Amino acid sequence: MSSVAVLTQESFAEHRSGLVPQQIKVATLNSEEENDPPTYKDAFPPLPEKAACLESAQEPAGAWSNKIRPIKASVITQVFHVPLEERKYKDMNQFGEGEQAKICLEIMQRTGAHLELSLAKDQGLSIMVSGKLDAVMKARKDIVARLQTQASATVPIPKEHHRFVIGKNGEKLQDLELKTATKIQIPRPDDPSNQIKITGTKEGIEKARHEVLLISAEQDKRAVERLEVEKAFHPFIAGPYNRLVGEIMQETGTRINIPPPSVNRTEIVFTGEKEQLAQAVARIKKIYEEKKKKTTTIAVEVKKSQHKYVIGPKGNSLQEILERTGVSVEIPPSDSISETVILRGEPEKLGQALTEVYAKANSFTVSSVSAPSWLHRFIIGKKGQNLAKITQQMPKVHIEFTEGEDKITLEGPTEDVNVAQEQIEGMVKDLINRMDYVEINIDHKFHRHLIGKSGANINRIKDQYKVSVRIPPDSEKSNLIRIEGDPQGVQQAKRELLELASRMENERTKDLIIEQRFHRTIIGQKGERIREIRDKFPEVIINFPDPAQKSDIVQLRGPKNEVEKCTKYMQKMVADLVENSYSISVPIFKQFHKNIIGKGGANIKKIREESNTKIDLPAENSNSETIIITGKRANCEAARSRILSIQKDLANIAEVEVSIPAKLHNSLIGTKGRLIRSIMEECGGVHIHFPVEGSGSDTVVIRGPSSDVEKAKKQLLHLAEEKQTKSFTVDIRAKPEYHKFLIGKGGGKIRKVRDSTGARIIFPAAEDKDQDLITIIGKEDAVREAQKELEALIQNLENVVEDYMLVDPKHHRHFVIRRGQVLREIAEEYGGVMVSFPRSGTQSDKVTLKGAKDCVEAAKKRIQEIIEDLEAQVTVECAIPQKFHRSVMGPKGSRIQQITRDYNVQIKFPDREENPVHSVEPSIQENGDEAGEGREAKETDPGSPRRCDIIIISGRKEKCEAAKEALEALVPVTIEVEVPFDLHRYIIGQKGSGIRKMMDEFEVNIHVPAPELQSDTIAITGLAANLDRAKAGLLDRVKELQAEQEDRALRSFKLSVTVDPKYHPKIIGRKGAVITQIRLEHEVNIQFPDKDDGNQPQDQITITGYEKNTEAARDAILKIVGELEQMVSEDVPLDHRVHARIIGARGKAIRKIMDEFKVDIRFPQSGAPDPNCVTVTGLPENVEEAIDHILNLEEEYLADVVDSEALQVYMKPPAHEESRAPSKGFVVRDAPWTSNSSEKAPDMSSSEEFPSFGAQVAPKTLPWGPKR
């Protein structure tokens, strides 16, 4: 590509304006030269000659290709073809195509490759896969496995070659499977089989088989050989630093494995090509034989501790000796006690090697420095700083500190060790001179207090005295604390720690019980009050419990005397709080509350301050009249008197005191104040105030309007008199087990006593503590009579007798079954009488009864009644279809249980029939006769009930009949109700909520027919008693829905209004404000035409709602249109430079003008033909006023603009510019087209004059771009 730039005079001047003044000056001096246009050759230099091109073309492309690495395409595409006979999904009509597509989609999602399928003419399947290389390979494997029919084949190769097919970590096998799109199964190592199974397409199997056989053939060329070589000669074969064996391996391409010195094996293993392996073995054998002949050994003793110096780091010293002298040094294993070192080599070199061994052994030394163990960490320094100074200078010296030992061990080169030892000894001497330590015993329970919160105490001591304090961890339970550092600091720290400890020993902890309700008050707002207490007792720590714990215990800890003082102070505070928490309620008529508060709360504030109480008034919107006063008792009473006096002064409020005995107060108040409240409400809302319970006062105060007070007084005195005459009370005692007998069945006995005497008899409730106490209340004579009767009954009950009766043994079981339930009921009902039946198995009919005489007689009578019931028992069958049984039983059998209790019968339901279909059974012979007669009758009577429908009722005949009627009454009945089909879905309700509600309310089942039936009836099933209610409820619902339908029809009245589309935005208003107002005001929906819908008339506005509302909305719209039609629009020229100022920030200024003059002002958009044209719309008089206003603003703002522009001229003077002449463009001299020579213009079609780049120069084809 080439680009052409045309340099005009304007652009040249613009370029020059950016030059620095110096450049401009030079440009001006040389203007004459610059005026001359450049020559064509200067402006367009010619291309290199042909020869140069040829030379450069002849160069190899290596320069380019060597520098740039090949760029591989990141996305590749491969096409696979699956022949018809190998396709897995051939028949497209049997969901094959769908399954095939589904599989392809799965493969794309899993691999990230893109698949495209197409069918060839031969019905073969072509699959194009695009994506990254690994994704394409995985997708290909999946396609073959899932879309192509699979075949399998086995390849036998030697077992030892299997591991080469698998490769390292199975990588080779995975690669092979991806390449060939097959599944290759290799037998496990413990399986003797040598068969490798390949599964895939025919083509894939062939490829995989070929690859496996290739790997095996490769391994056949390789061989493994083991050579026994004495362990002592291994170093000679390996050579110094394994160089010799490395050279042999490189030259022969054979892998040689020499066992390491630590492994006691002698064989050397060779692996590689047979010929090269033979060469390597021969060379090793030669070295071995040669060394065996020439070498000899000497043994020397070297200290065990010096062996490691002879070996050197990673055995480097041994390799160094071997390299220099050719002698191998054998060191005994570290676990051996031997100190003998053997040197093996040629005799003349052994001397030199021995010298080196001793030099290595003695090159390092071990030394120790005596230093107290407590100084070790000071020698090491913070983060090892002190020690680092020594080790940096002498890196080969190893310094070791042993915990608990008073020495430091140094190890390394002798010279370095000596220097390091001197330095450490100097450090130790210096530390001993200027440091000291002391150990003190403090009970470990105080250690955490010495440390303080987050180590605050101990860190302060450390920093203050420049010492180190070592406190043992809690787990050690040790009392010993060690202080180390400057001698003076150590003594000071010791003194402070002991003082702290002694202070803690004198400390005590005390638990103070304070009700949790006072905790917040004691703490105060933002902890102000508790801060005062802590400032008063700074040495005492006060801990309040967590509010969530609901605990009353406040813990004080500190010096004994201070804790005692703090305890007394807090107890006094709590006593004051308790005293001040007395509370009384004052009922004040609601209309006087504002007078009690006073202007700006002046009255109530004055009462609070003078009485020192807290006064809470009910909220204004509350119905409560009660004012609550809290504080000291005397203060509360004073505040109450003042509030009542205000009320008395304000209105005609009378106050009367009535004397009523204190013992009658509770009975007059009634349960939860119901009785007294009813009198207060009945008498015009008077206030009746009873004295505090336990005060002993008889005075009751009635307060209110005088007429109402008198009425309340009369009622109260009448009620008190009535209570007094009837309030004679006597308490008698009787054992709780007698109570039921005294009450009698269904309360019959006690009712008889009440009716005969007129007294009220109260038995204790289950929760009462005194269960023996029976209270008789009423007039004195009635109470005495009732007492006499009850005491006679109790006396009879206390006379215990023993009696017996005869009961047929066949009835015994009825009394004792269900763990003696019947006997327990008799005992409870008849004063705890004991009934004993003979043991089962004995044929005795004697039953013993023991208890009070009356109880025994009553129990005998009851047992006799039960026996008579049992003897008179009959069984009645009640036929009810089995489908209704569950409904008859009721939830958890509640209905049946009720019937059995009411009629004293037993009811048994049949077992559910598994197969309700009647089957004809063959006749069965019984005692030689055919039982065909009965069966024949049964079969011929289709009306007879099924066995599974019959419910059996047992009991007295009349009770069984009554129970049968009750059961039949429980059989559900179905009725049909006419309900229009279109209302069914509304009756059902959302998710069936409507119908479910009706079913629950009326206890029936409502069945709505399926929608496809379009039936107008709804079936109601349930008890006859509930059906009428349910039907009425359903019909009421139908009426409601029909009324809603009618209302919906009325609401859907539509009205269209024709309005010019230009007025639509005005009717809608800013952010829809105007139209929303109309919608809400008239409760209608207003629809504007869709601008994008060409078929819809654009001037029609649709209003939907009630007819009357739509007409009102239409009138409102037409009124707006009428106003808009009266409006005029005028264009006014307004300088664009002042537009922004008139509009203002975020349009505030222009909005203010539009609101003030009730006009609409539109400014031109950027790029408008006339940027000064502003349109003002509104009523004519408003438009005129608005235009005058904005023109005035323009005049004012333009003056500012002109001043600003004039100032800018002086602030930024124009750059030096030459007078601009008409642009000549870019001019050159001696151009080919301007020459007068007779040369004709070049022929563009000629390859000689316009040669193509590199076309003639191709003696040798060289690829363009990087080498492959």
From Swiss-Prot:
One of its GO terms (cellular component) is high-density lipoprotein particle. SMART domains: KH. The modification Phosphotyrosine is found at residue 437. One of its GO terms (molecular function) is RNA binding. Keywords: Acetylation, Cholesterol metabolism, Cytoplasm, HDL, Lipid metabolism, Lipid transport, Nucleus, Phosphoprotein, Repeat, RNA-binding, Steroid metabolism, Sterol metabolism, Transport. Residues 1233-1249 have a biased composition (Polar residues). PROSITE patterns: KH_TYPE_1. Gene3D superfamilies: K Homology domain, type 1 (3.30.1370.10). SUPFAM superfamilies: Eukaryotic type KH-domain (KH-domain type I). Residues 910-947, 1213-1268 are annotated as: Disordered. One of its GO terms (biological process) is cholesterol metabolic process. InterPro entries: KH_dom (IPR004087), KH_dom_type_1 (IPR004088), KH_dom_type_1_sf (IPR036612). Appears to play a role in cell sterol metabolism. It may function to protect cells from over-accumulation of cholesterol. This is Vigilin. The lineage of its organism: Eukaryota, Metazoa, Chordata, Craniata, Vertebrata.
